[in-house]
Amino acid sequence: MSEKMVAIMKTKPEYGAELVEVDVPKPGPGEVLIKILATSICGTDLHIYEWNEWAQTRIRPPQIMGHEVAGEVVEVGPGVEGIEVGDYVSVETHIVCGKCYACKRGQYHVCQNTKIFGVDTDGVFAEYAVVPAQNVWKNPKNIPPEYATLQEPLGNAVDTVLAGPIAGKSVLITGAGPLGLLGIAVAKASGAYPVIVSEPSEFRRNLAKKVGADYVINPFEEDVVKEVMDITDGNGVDVFLEFSGAPKALEQGLQAVTPAGRVSLLGLFPGKVSIDFNNLIIFKALTVYGITGRHLWETWYTVSRLLQSGKLNIDPIITHKYKGFDKYEEAFELMRAGKTGKVVFMLK
């Protein structure tokens, strides 16, 4: 193994990133070194690349970017048990303390001292990466790397869709970005019908159809609530899944969901949102879930089994694959333009 590696690094507190050569890291106690086989771009990575307000308060350059990954263990640090060289793995990004009130109740996904791998630490946009052993997930060999790298965001989608019963339920999904597209795939694989998708981008509406959406709506040109009511015989949808983070989409979804229906919110909104709680939530007796992270490790088991079942139609979601990191700037600019689903760097 070479002592040097290539990595996409946020070198300066400004727009963009650089492709650099750095030393291959060494695993310390409780850590493993993995060789990257595939890694995918997340919206968080795009925020770091763009150097938005959130990134400016959270990221401390120089830092290797990336956190969605599939790889092979090539070295194990002192004190690590249950993980061996040659294991095919992915990584849970939430590094939890195990000591706080939430962790002691088994609610690791809301650990009060969470650090994010690839945000608060160096990440996986590199040929090798050091990972906390406690965050390693062993993959079955029959899941290809370009799928295995998607398990972290797929876990977000699974928790959003499966927060309540979904089989045989009518569903409205607002936002068909990468996470919304994964949500469509999970809903269809889990027996939802019809799955209605509201998305302003024609490119993403077409992707939604390919993934399995039964109806697509352009919210800029059509009345979302009217369309949903027409499709559902005036009843509204049983389940509303919000992936966009758009306040208007939230309001439309709450209007379109049936009384005593279920709502799952994953999209992040730009600040405070004004909602008529009395008429849209309380008097409708809605059950509303806020979704963050993934349940450790229940969600990972669900994701892995869904992938192994062959029922998840995620091929259309992976719109761009790059061999290595050389065209990383093109990849990020395409994502900025909204012209991608998931973008995967293949290093195998």
From Swiss-Prot:
Pathway membership, UniProt: Amino-acid degradation; L-threonine degradation via oxydo-reductase pathway; glycine from L-threonine: step 1/2
UniProtKB keywords: Cytoplasm, Metal-binding, NAD, Oxidoreductase, Zinc
Catalytic activity, reaction form: L-threonine + NAD(+) = (2S)-2-amino-3-oxobutanoate + NADH + H(+)
Subcellular location, principal: cytoplasm
Reported pH dependence: Optimum pH is 10.0.
Binding site for NAD(+): 179, 199, 204, 266-268, 291-292
Location in or out of the cell: Cytoplasm
GO cellular component: cytoplasm
Cofactor(s) the record lists: Zn(2+)
Cofactor note: Binds 2 Zn(2+) ions per subunit.
Site (Important for catalytic activity for the proton relay mechanism but does not participate directly in the coordination of zinc atom): 152
Assembly information from the UniProt record: Homotetramer.
Matches recorded under NCBIfam families: PRK05396.1 (NF003808), tdh (TIGR00692)
Full protein name: L-threonine 3-dehydrogenase
The species this protein was found in: Pyrococcus furiosus (strain ATCC 43587 / DSM 3638 / JCM 8422 / Vc1)
